[in-house]
UniProtKB/Swiss-Prot annotation:
Keywords: Cell membrane, Lipoprotein, Membrane, Palmitate, Signal. It is found in: Cell membrane. GO terms for cellular component: plasma membrane. A lipid is attached at C18 (S-diacylglycerol cysteine). This is Efem/EfeO family lipoprotein. Residues 20-50 are annotated as: Disordered. It is a lipid-anchor.
Amino acid sequence: MKKLPTILLASSLLLAACGNNSHSDDNSNKDKQSQSSKGENKASLQKATKEYEKYTDGQLDKFLDGTEKFVAAIKADDMDKAKELYPKVRMYYERSEPVAEAFGDLDPKIDARLADMKEEKKEDQWTGYHKIEKSLYQDNKIDETTKKDADQLLKDAKELDAKADTLDITPKLMLQGSVDLLNEVSTSKITGEEEIYSHTDLYDFKANIEGAQKIYELFKPELNKKDKKLSADIQKNFDKVNQLLDKYKDGDGFKDYSAVTKEDRKALSDAVNSLGEPLSKMAVVTE
Protein backbone atom coordinates (compact mmCIF):
# COMPACT_ATOMS: atom_id res chain seq x y z
CA MET A 1 0.00 0.00 0.00
CA LYS A 2 2.89 2.36 0.69
CA LYS A 3 4.03 2.10 -2.97
CA LEU A 4 0.78 3.49 -4.32
CA PRO A 5 1.66 7.19 -3.86
CA THR A 6 4.93 6.60 -5.70
CA ILE A 7 3.07 4.99 -8.59
CA LEU A 8 0.51 7.81 -8.63
CA LEU A 9 3.26 10.42 -8.59
CA ALA A 10 5.05 8.73 -11.44
CA SER A 11 1.80 8.53 -13.40
CA SER A 12 1.10 12.21 -12.77
CA LEU A 13 4.56 13.19 -13.92
CA LEU A 14 4.17 11.06 -17.02
CA LEU A 15 0.81 12.66 -17.85
CA ALA A 16 2.24 16.11 -17.21
CA ALA A 17 5.18 15.35 -19.46
CA CYS A 18 2.82 14.17 -22.17
CA GLY A 19 0.77 17.34 -21.75
CA ASN A 20 3.88 19.49 -22.00
CA ASN A 21 5.02 17.61 -25.08
CA SER A 22 1.59 18.10 -26.64
CA HIS A 23 1.70 21.83 -25.86
CA SER A 24 5.23 22.01 -27.23
CA ASP A 25 4.12 20.22 -30.40
CA ASP A 26 1.24 22.69 -30.81
CA ASN A 27 3.62 25.63 -30.52
CA SER A 28 6.03 24.02 -32.92
CA ASN A 29 3.24 23.43 -35.46
CA LYS A 30 2.05 27.03 -35.10
CA ASP A 31 5.59 28.29 -35.63
CA LYS A 32 5.93 26.15 -38.73
CA GLN A 33 2.57 27.38 -40.05
CA SER A 34 3.57 30.98 -39.35
CA GLN A 35 6.90 30.55 -41.11
CA SER A 36 5.18 28.83 -44.03
CA SER A 37 2.62 31.66 -44.26
CA LYS A 38 5.37 34.30 -44.19
CA GLY A 39 7.25 32.40 -46.86
CA GLU A 40 4.16 32.24 -49.08
CA ASN A 41 3.50 35.95 -48.50
CA LYS A 42 7.06 36.86 -49.45
CA ALA A 43 6.90 34.73 -52.59
CA SER A 44 3.56 36.29 -53.54
CA LEU A 45 4.90 39.84 -53.11
CA GLN A 46 8.01 39.01 -55.12
CA LYS A 47 5.85 37.59 -57.92
CA ALA A 48 3.64 40.71 -57.95
CA THR A 49 6.70 42.95 -58.05
CA LYS A 50 8.24 41.01 -60.94
CA GLU A 51 4.98 41.22 -62.87
CA TYR A 52 4.79 44.96 -62.28
CA GLU A 53 8.37 45.37 -63.46
CA LYS A 54 7.36 43.63 -66.70
CA TYR A 55 4.32 45.90 -66.96
CA THR A 56 6.41 49.04 -66.44
CA ASP A 57 9.01 47.81 -68.91
CA GLY A 58 6.28 47.30 -71.50
CA GLN A 59 4.77 50.74 -70.89
CA LEU A 60 8.15 52.43 -71.21
CA ASP A 61 8.86 50.53 -74.44
CA LYS A 62 5.60 51.85 -75.87
CA PHE A 63 6.36 55.29 -74.49
CA LEU A 64 9.64 55.31 -76.40
CA ASP A 65 7.98 54.08 -79.60
CA GLY A 66 5.32 56.76 -79.30
CA THR A 67 7.85 59.45 -78.49
CA GLU A 68 9.81 58.56 -81.63
CA LYS A 69 6.64 59.08 -83.70
CA PHE A 70 5.85 62.30 -81.83
CA VAL A 71 9.34 63.69 -82.44
CA ALA A 72 9.17 62.66 -86.11
CA ALA A 73 5.95 64.66 -86.47
CA ILE A 74 7.61 67.72 -84.95
CA LYS A 75 10.63 67.37 -87.23
CA ALA A 76 8.23 67.19 -90.18
CA ASP A 77 6.43 70.36 -88.97
CA ASP A 78 3.23 68.30 -88.73
CA MET A 79 1.36 70.18 -86.00
CA ASP A 80 -1.87 68.16 -86.34
CA LYS A 81 -0.07 64.82 -86.04
CA ALA A 82 1.96 66.01 -83.07
CA LYS A 83 -1.21 67.15 -81.28
CA GLU A 84 -2.93 63.86 -82.09
CA LEU A 85 -0.05 61.87 -80.61
CA TYR A 86 0.70 64.07 -77.59
CA PRO A 87 -1.96 62.86 -75.09
CA LYS A 88 -1.94 59.24 -76.25
CA VAL A 89 1.82 58.79 -76.00
CA ARG A 90 1.89 60.42 -72.59
CA MET A 91 -0.56 57.83 -71.26
CA TYR A 92 2.20 55.19 -71.32
CA TYR A 93 4.29 57.39 -69.06
CA GLU A 94 1.38 58.27 -66.79
CA ARG A 95 0.54 54.57 -66.26
CA SER A 96 4.07 54.12 -64.94
CA GLU A 97 3.90 57.15 -62.67
CA PRO A 98 3.24 55.26 -59.40
CA VAL A 99 6.94 54.31 -59.48
CA ALA A 100 8.27 57.50 -61.11
CA GLU A 101 10.41 58.01 -58.01
CA ALA A 102 12.59 55.19 -59.37
CA PHE A 103 13.19 57.19 -62.58
CA GLY A 104 15.51 59.59 -60.77
CA ASP A 105 16.23 62.90 -62.53
CA LEU A 106 14.71 61.60 -65.77
CA ASP A 107 11.22 62.17 -64.36
CA PRO A 108 11.54 65.98 -64.13
CA LYS A 109 13.45 66.06 -67.43
CA ILE A 110 10.54 64.34 -69.16
CA ASP A 111 7.50 65.47 -67.18
CA ALA A 112 8.18 68.73 -65.29
CA ARG A 113 5.71 71.60 -65.56
CA LEU A 114 6.86 75.20 -65.99
CA ALA A 115 5.35 76.08 -62.59
CA ASP A 116 7.52 73.41 -60.94
CA MET A 117 10.66 74.78 -62.56
CA LYS A 118 9.81 78.37 -61.63
CA GLU A 119 9.27 77.34 -58.04
CA GLU A 120 12.78 75.92 -57.99
CA LYS A 121 14.11 78.88 -60.00
CA LYS A 122 15.21 76.50 -62.76
CA GLU A 123 12.95 77.59 -65.61
CA ASP A 124 16.00 78.00 -67.85
CA GLN A 125 16.57 74.23 -67.46
CA TRP A 126 13.01 73.28 -68.43
CA THR A 127 12.76 70.34 -70.86
CA GLY A 128 10.32 67.59 -71.72
CA TYR A 129 6.80 67.01 -72.92
CA HIS A 130 5.20 70.00 -71.21
CA LYS A 131 7.65 72.45 -72.75
CA ILE A 132 6.72 71.10 -76.17
CA GLU A 133 3.06 71.16 -75.13
CA LYS A 134 3.37 74.93 -74.62
CA SER A 135 4.85 75.35 -78.10
CA LEU A 136 2.11 73.31 -79.75
CA TYR A 137 -0.97 74.47 -77.88
CA GLN A 138 -0.22 77.98 -76.58
CA ASP A 139 2.38 79.37 -78.97
CA ASN A 140 0.86 77.31 -81.79
CA LYS A 141 4.17 76.88 -83.55
CA ILE A 142 6.99 74.46 -84.24
CA ASP A 143 10.32 76.23 -84.53
CA GLU A 144 13.97 75.29 -84.16
CA THR A 145 13.74 75.50 -80.37
CA THR A 146 10.81 73.07 -80.42
CA LYS A 147 12.81 70.66 -82.56
CA LYS A 148 15.78 70.95 -80.24
CA ASP A 149 13.50 70.22 -77.28
CA ALA A 150 12.14 67.21 -79.17
CA ASP A 151 15.67 65.86 -79.68
CA GLN A 152 16.34 66.15 -75.94
CA LEU A 153 13.01 64.50 -75.11
CA LEU A 154 13.80 61.53 -77.34
CA LYS A 155 17.25 61.20 -75.79
CA ASP A 156 15.73 61.13 -72.29
CA ALA A 157 13.01 58.66 -73.31
CA LYS A 158 15.67 56.33 -74.72
CA GLU A 159 17.71 56.58 -71.53
CA LEU A 160 14.67 55.81 -69.39
CA ASP A 161 13.73 52.81 -71.50
CA ALA A 162 17.30 51.51 -71.24
CA LYS A 163 17.09 51.80 -67.44
CA ALA A 164 13.76 49.96 -67.22
CA ASP A 165 15.32 46.58 -66.40
CA THR A 166 17.37 48.04 -63.54
CA LEU A 167 14.74 50.20 -61.83
CA ASP A 168 14.59 49.67 -58.06
CA ILE A 169 10.91 48.75 -57.72
CA THR A 170 9.70 47.34 -54.39
CA PRO A 171 6.26 46.44 -52.97
CA LYS A 172 6.54 49.47 -50.68
CA LEU A 173 7.20 51.82 -53.61
CA MET A 174 4.32 50.31 -55.60
CA LEU A 175 1.86 50.61 -52.72
CA GLN A 176 2.91 54.06 -51.54
CA GLY A 177 3.38 55.34 -55.07
CA SER A 178 -0.16 54.41 -56.11
CA VAL A 179 -1.65 56.16 -53.06
CA ASP A 180 0.51 59.28 -53.50
CA LEU A 181 -0.44 59.46 -57.17
CA LEU A 182 -4.17 59.31 -56.44
CA ASN A 183 -3.75 62.01 -53.80
CA GLU A 184 -2.04 64.14 -56.43
CA VAL A 185 -4.85 63.51 -58.92
CA SER A 186 -7.60 64.44 -56.45
CA THR A 187 -5.94 67.56 -55.03
CA SER A 188 -3.76 69.18 -57.69
CA LYS A 189 -4.10 67.46 -61.06
CA ILE A 190 -7.88 67.84 -60.81
CA THR A 191 -7.44 71.61 -61.19
CA GLY A 192 -6.05 71.16 -64.70
CA GLU A 193 -2.58 72.30 -63.69
CA GLU A 194 -0.64 69.53 -65.45
CA GLU A 195 -1.99 69.87 -68.99
CA ILE A 196 -2.51 73.60 -68.65
CA TYR A 197 -1.98 74.33 -72.37
CA SER A 198 -3.51 71.26 -74.06
CA HIS A 199 -6.37 70.49 -71.61
CA THR A 200 -5.74 66.77 -72.15
CA ASP A 201 -5.92 66.07 -68.40
CA LEU A 202 -8.53 63.32 -68.71
CA TYR A 203 -6.05 61.16 -70.64
CA ASP A 204 -3.63 61.55 -67.72
CA PHE A 205 -6.29 60.75 -65.12
CA LYS A 206 -7.33 57.59 -66.94
CA ALA A 207 -3.73 56.42 -67.28
CA ASN A 208 -2.97 57.21 -63.62
CA ILE A 209 -5.99 55.19 -62.51
CA GLU A 210 -4.99 52.31 -64.79
CA GLY A 211 -1.47 52.33 -63.35
CA ALA A 212 -2.75 52.24 -59.77
CA GLN A 213 -5.32 49.59 -60.65
CA LYS A 214 -2.63 47.36 -62.13
CA ILE A 215 -0.84 47.42 -58.77
CA TYR A 216 -4.07 46.53 -56.97
CA GLU A 217 -4.77 43.65 -59.36
CA LEU A 218 -1.28 42.21 -58.84
CA PHE A 219 -1.61 42.33 -55.05
CA LYS A 220 -5.28 41.30 -55.07
CA PRO A 221 -4.73 37.53 -54.53
CA GLU A 222 -2.69 38.23 -51.39
CA LEU A 223 -5.06 40.99 -50.25
CA ASN A 224 -8.03 38.61 -50.55
CA LYS A 225 -6.29 36.30 -48.07
CA LYS A 226 -5.81 39.15 -45.60
CA ASP A 227 -8.96 41.25 -46.01
CA LYS A 228 -11.60 40.34 -48.59
CA LYS A 229 -13.85 43.22 -47.53
CA LEU A 230 -11.08 45.76 -48.11
CA SER A 231 -10.31 44.22 -51.49
CA ALA A 232 -13.96 44.41 -52.53
CA ASP A 233 -14.16 48.03 -51.35
CA ILE A 234 -11.12 48.97 -53.45
CA GLN A 235 -12.57 47.25 -56.52
CA LYS A 236 -15.92 49.00 -56.04
CA ASN A 237 -14.23 52.40 -55.89
CA PHE A 238 -12.06 51.70 -58.94
CA ASP A 239 -15.26 50.83 -60.83
CA LYS A 240 -16.88 54.08 -59.73
CA VAL A 241 -13.94 56.24 -60.85
CA ASN A 242 -13.72 54.44 -64.20
CA GLN A 243 -17.46 54.91 -64.77
CA LEU A 244 -17.09 58.65 -64.15
CA LEU A 245 -14.15 58.89 -66.57
CA ASP A 246 -16.09 56.96 -69.20
CA LYS A 247 -18.62 59.82 -69.27
CA TYR A 248 -15.97 62.00 -70.89
CA LYS A 249 -14.89 59.62 -73.65
CA ASP A 250 -14.80 61.06 -77.13
CA GLY A 251 -14.14 58.45 -79.79
CA ASP A 252 -10.88 56.74 -78.90
CA GLY A 253 -9.88 59.64 -76.65
CA PHE A 254 -11.34 62.08 -74.14
CA LYS A 255 -13.01 65.47 -74.19
CA ASP A 256 -11.16 68.72 -73.64
CA TYR A 257 -10.85 69.16 -69.87
CA SER A 258 -11.98 72.78 -70.09
CA ALA A 259 -15.45 71.40 -70.91
CA VAL A 260 -15.66 69.62 -67.53
CA THR A 261 -17.67 71.77 -65.11
CA LYS A 262 -16.54 72.73 -61.63
CA GLU A 263 -19.22 70.47 -60.16
CA ASP A 264 -18.13 67.51 -62.29
CA ARG A 265 -14.50 68.08 -61.33
CA LYS A 266 -15.49 67.96 -57.67
CA ALA A 267 -17.42 64.73 -58.22
CA LEU A 268 -14.38 63.21 -59.88
CA SER A 269 -12.10 64.46 -57.10
CA ASP A 270 -14.42 63.01 -54.44
CA ALA A 271 -14.50 59.65 -56.22
CA VAL A 272 -10.70 59.50 -56.42
CA ASN A 273 -10.50 60.46 -52.73
CA SER A 274 -12.93 57.69 -51.86
CA LEU A 275 -10.70 55.26 -53.74
CA GLY A 276 -7.52 56.53 -52.12
CA GLU A 277 -8.80 55.87 -48.61
CA PRO A 278 -9.16 52.06 -48.84
CA LEU A 279 -6.20 51.84 -51.22
CA SER A 280 -3.99 53.36 -48.51
CA LYS A 281 -4.79 50.32 -46.33
CA MET A 282 -3.57 47.86 -48.95
CA ALA A 283 -0.17 47.74 -47.23
CA VAL A 284 -1.74 44.99 -45.08
CA VAL A 285 -0.51 42.60 -47.79
CA THR A 286 3.06 43.09 -46.56
CA GLU A 287 2.21 42.10 -42.97
